[in-house]
A protein has these predicted regions:
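Surface-exposed acidic/polar loop and edge beta-strand patches at domain peripheries
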Residues: 1-138, 146-154, 158-300
Length: 300
């Protein structure tokens, strides 16, 4: 049985779904971010926050992402890093994380969290539907183009996940190498290839960070809590989302300790580089609509 609930945090309405195992809540007014992903049986909160009180506040369109609440999981589209594309100054972490999304009350009555947003610069309409079945979540996405011509884009799920000493990733099979976006301690530059062992070393660091990409492989990845072996498992269709972004900071970025697994259409994080150099991106034709999905499973 799935229960619908509403609450409020710092003046912002939250809406969520609850099963015997999982509780998830979102903030429609703040990018429809996933505020909390909570295992009710183990009492583990998977979503990290920069603020001990998980404080929420609004941001202006175009703000740097690190000026935001840094809480939970955001949607990033059509870029992650800021860049200029087709005469548009695309903002840091995309166009929708700082925007208010529309909640579909009819779908909510049917135990679905459906929210939608029109991008301010790129002529797209993005709709996301979250459904819950016991310990399993499904995120369904629909992207509709209102553009007069084809538009390349990147979409990435952008969760900030709690990460502690002893925690570790399980990456898609097969994964042998990482394609670096940026790294510190050790330093790495965009396009470098690192052995996957470097990720394990970074997880044990106290002063580094790493953003890298791997091919989606079998479309499965997980974050494992080292002490309890609890797992957050992601699965997706690698034909739809052929890359996985990996982010980890062990004190190297603003002193924070968190991690992310980011299924995505392409790489690296800047749309212009993804199109012109790496040639790893998606494209939506004039008037076209596309769909993709992602699954999350929480284990004890």
């Amino acid at each position: 049985m799935t229960e619908i609930f509403r609450s409020e945090k710092d003046g912002f309405p939250l809406v969520g779904l609850r099963s015997e195992v999982v509780e998830i809540s979102i903030v429609p007014a703040l990018g429809a971010r996933v505020f909390s992903l909570f295992n009710r049986r183990t009492r583990r909160e998977w979503m990290w926050s920069a603020s001990e009180k998980r404080k929420l506040f609004p941001n202006a369109f175009g703000d740097a992402f690190e000026q935001g609440t840094l809480t939970g999981a955001d949607e990033c589209i059509p870029t992650i890093l800021p860049c200029r594309w087709k005469g548009r100054d695309l903002p840091d972490h995309g166009e929708v994380w700082s925007r208010s999304w529309q909640l579909d009350e009819k779908d909510l009555a049917a135990e679905k969290l459906t929210t939608s947003v029109t991008l301010p610069l790129t002529p797209f309409l993005l709709t996301r539907t979250i459904s819950l079945n016991n310990a399993d979540l499904r995120f369904d996405y629909q992207l509709e183009s209102k553009a007069p011509e084809s538009e390349p884009f990147l979409w990435s799920w952008h969760p900030l996940l709690c990460f502690e000493d002893g925690d570790y990733f399980e990456l898609p099979s097969p994964t042998e190498d990482l394609k670096v976006e940026i790294a510190l301690n050790p330093t790495g530059a965009r396009g470098e290839t690192w052995p996957v062992e470097r990720l394990r070393q970074m997880a044990g660091s106290q002063d580094g960070f790493l953003k890298a990409f791997v091919p989606a492989g079998n479309g499965k990845a997980a974050l494992v809590h080292g002490k309890t072996k609890e797992r957050l498992e992601l699965s997706w269709n690698p034909d739809q989302l052929p890359w996985l972004g990996i982010w980890i900071t062990r004190g190297g970025w603003n002193g924070y300790h968190h991690a992310a697994l980011e299924p995505t259409h392409g790489a690296p994080d800047a749309l212009d580089v993804a199109v012109e150099q790496w040639r790893a991106h998606a494209t939506l034709a004039c008037g076209e609509t596309t769909h993709w999905h992602m699954n999350i499973h929480l284990t004890e």
